[in-house]
Amino acid sequence: YKRQMDKYAFMDALKAGKFNHEKIDVIFHEGACSDTMEYNGKYMMENNFEYTKNVLHFCLDRKIQMMYASSASTYGSGAHGFREEPACEEALNVYAFSKLFFDNYLRRLLPQAQSQVVGLRYFNVYGPQENHKGKMASMIYQMYNQWKAEHKVRLFGEYAGYGPGEHTRDFVYVKDVVKVNFYFWDHPEISGIFNCGTGHAHQFNTLAKAVLNHFGSGELEYVPFPEVLKGKYQSFTEADDTNLLAAGYDGGFTPIEEAAEEYCQLLDKTGGYYVYEG
């Protein structure tokens, strides 16, 4: 990395005009407070709405391409489907609300925008370079480390009509997320909000078995569903990729078993980080 900056230092520099004369082709704005259990609305809006809004206007004013991380959390329970349209959107927590609030802000500006802006609604992303996320790192990362510590992995028990470990998500490998971002970078004529998921949902049990298969042993344990998550938890997600495919993306998505094993091997080797070996 070059010129790494703290997020607050970056925003101070942006507002002070420190980047006004830089040649910038594209900004990938992937950062946010992604803690779905964060209840401080002011903090969440400052980090996920105001911060992103400042980056957006910097890009629009200078006609810089911008890709930013939206979230599948904007669909809530998914009772109305997972299409990129208001009829399907239902924020269940402060994080989801902050993401949806910005998406709607962008929708009002897009007709007048003279440069590309793409919001990607990430589903359950997993893969390398996520160690720093702590409790918000992917479930496969959590399960891998549970096995290393205890030779077992734990999943939630039954809740909302789903059996133990049967809550179902659209798990998408971070390598594929990068491919989607780069596709839009190569197509500056396309703007909008698009789902970024495989279009195929899998149970958490499937991920757990992939981890256990990697190690060749271990126990799968189910724990009571936490009271604090009831009413705020997405039991099912599955991207509707109609608009993504209509935009021309044809890079496909890595099968979950293949990606999970590749990631586990990298966790074995480096703790989950790509290491430059030049």
Question: What annotation goes with each model-predicted range?
Answer:
Residues 1:
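Conserved small/polar residues in nucleotide/adenosyl-binding loops
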Residues 92, 123-137, 158-175:
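Glycine-rich "substrate-gating" loop/helix at the edge of Rossmann-like oxidoreductase active sites
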Residues 61, 77, 92-123, 142-149:
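Active-site Tyr-X1-5-Lys
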Residues 147-278:
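C-terminal substrate-binding subdomain of Rossmann-fold SDR/epimerase-dehydratase oxidoreductases
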Residues 23-29, 53-94:
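Conserved Rossmann-fold NAD(P)-dependent oxidoreductase catalytic core, especially the SDR/UDP-sugar
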Residues 47-52, 59, 67, 98-99, ...:
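Short alpha-helix in the Rossmann-fold core of NAD(P)-dependent oxidoreductases
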Residues 7-47:
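NAD(P)H-binding glycine-rich loop region in Rossmannoid oxidoreductase-like domains
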Residues 45, 91-100, 133-141, 170-171, ...:
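Short-chain dehydrogenase/reductase
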